[in-house]
A protein has these predicted regions:
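Short beta-strand elements bearing conserved aromatic residues within extracellular beta-rich modules
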Residues: 20-22, 62, 157
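Alpha/beta-hydrolase fold nucleophile elbow
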Residues: 243-256
Length: 261
């Protein structure tokens, strides 16, 4: 697989860009403890490129991070047999806010951390049930504003239902709700899977993180957050869309900090 990026400022004679870091899910990202990879400029052109091998089944996202610096990462990242994990994470943490999506890739959005990403899948990537029917009709979700007395803040919450109204419907809580509501709307996928009988009719609650600071504070194992959800939010949701109180009929889904939650 070859990645290409064109420097808007032109060649090395007119541009200040020294690196174009490539952040690829599961390949060069901070979870892999892999040395950072930069595209290389083709001399005397505005073209940068990087080539790597990918599994035929791979699917994920990627982004470019142009930089005017040669040394965005500490030297410990490039020394020894393995990069220093903490130094690697710190380097990516500083760089990711400056990430850009691929301007030639129409399938681009803002990822869960708020930075731009683009989609990529190899020819043998497995089918994604539900997502392969984007035109499935669905009932429009309701967006409310939750004012939390315990957390002393307010945020958006989306309530989405499938099937007929019933107090026995399961409950699914999706963290990073703004991502699944706006960046990558999950509604048609859930509706499709429900229509096919692969998911039961359910009540879905998508909780906004407000911003990255609140996400970092509230999601990783924060009992106050969950007490607020349980005591404040869910009773409000239940008055609008009845659902079952049974633990075995309840799902909480999240990724990264949401997974820790």
């Amino acid at each position: 697989m070859t990645f290409w990026w064109r420097d808007p400022a032109g060649t090395q004679k007119t541009s200040t860009i020294k690196r174009v870091w490539l952040y690829v899910t599961g390949v060069t990202d901070h979870h892999q403890n892999a040395r950072p990879q930069s595209l290389e400029r083709i001399p005397d052109t505005d073209v940068w490129q990087w080539q790597g091998e990918f599994s035929p089944e791979w699917r994920g996202s990627y982004c470019f991070i142009p930089s005017d610096n040669e040394d965005d990462f500490a030297s410990a990242v490039f020394e020894g047999e393995q990069p220093d994990r903490m130094a690697l994470r710190e380097g990516w943490r500083k760089l990711l806010p400056h990430a850009v999506s691929d301007p030639l890739n129409a399938q681009s959005w803002r990822g869960g951390r708020g930075h731009a990403v683009s989609a990529l899948e190899m020819p043998e990537a497995p089918v994604q049930p539900g997502w392969n029917h984007p035109d499935t009709p669905y009932k429009k979700p309701v967006c409310i504003e939750w004012h939390s007395a315990r957390l002393k803040n307010r945020r958006r919450v989306w309530i989405f239902t499938t099937g007929d109204e019933s107090p026995e419907r399961p409950l699914a809580v999706l963290l990073d709700g703004q991502f699944w509501a706006e960046s990558m709307p999950v509604w048609p996928a859930l509706a499709s899977l429900t229509h096919e009988g692969k998911l039961p009719p359910a009540v879905y609650v998508l909780i906004d993180v407000i911003d990255t600071a609140h996400r970092s504070r509230e999601l990783p194992c924060n009992p106050d957050f969950w007490l607020a959800v349980q005591d404040e939010l869910l009773p409000q949701v239940k008055s609008m869309a009845p659902f079952s109180d049974r633990a075995d009929h309840t799902v909480v889904a999240g990724q990264s900090f949401g997974g820790l939650s």
